[in-house]
Amino acid sequence: MHPGINGKKFPNKPALIMNGSGKVVTHGELNDLSNQGAQLFRSLGLVPGDSIAIMLENHFLFFPIIFAAWRSGLRYTAISWRLQPDEVEYIVRDCEAKVFITSKFLEETALNLDSSLKDVHKFMLDGSTDNYLSYEESIASQPE
């Protein structure tokens, strides 16, 4: 179901509850986060049919990111965080990703990929590092 529907009907009800941390994302927050992500993807020049790649551990922003891709008409490829950098690079290239999103938890792998993904927009959750912009800061500047 489109996040905007439940975001309006049940803005304060939980949409996601993370098992390990207990982090709760409401339907309203899911709608806002996915809309901001979609706005970010559009601002980068992505158009329907383009692709993004996501490599995350069990992270609460995974679903807002895939809903953002869905809202934008983008394809998304989820990549196991247990793969080696050369395997991740192959998948990112093979799916023709224009955006690669990972997290600070996976910084070592991300830095090993940096030079091979020069033509890909790179974002990091929970922080930033060389050539990886903070995803949270990037969506914060986008309209809800």
Set out the residue ranges of the language-model regions.
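Flexible acidic/glycine-rich loop/turn elements at helix↔coil and beta-strand↔loop transitions
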Residues: 6-12
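Conserved AMP-binding/adenylate-forming core of the ANL superfamily
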Residues: 12-59, 63, 67, 84-89, ...
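Short acidic/polar active-site loop segments enriched in Thr and Asp
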Residues: 47, 98, 120
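Short hydrophobic alpha-helices that are characteristic scaffold elements of the AMP-binding
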Residues: 66-72, 94
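Short beta->alpha connector loops at strand-helix junctions that form conserved
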Residues: 79-80, 103, 126
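Conserved ATP-dependent adenylate/AMP-binding module captured primarily in the ANL superfamily
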Residues: 83-112, 136-142
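ANL superfamily adenylate-forming
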Residues: 108-144
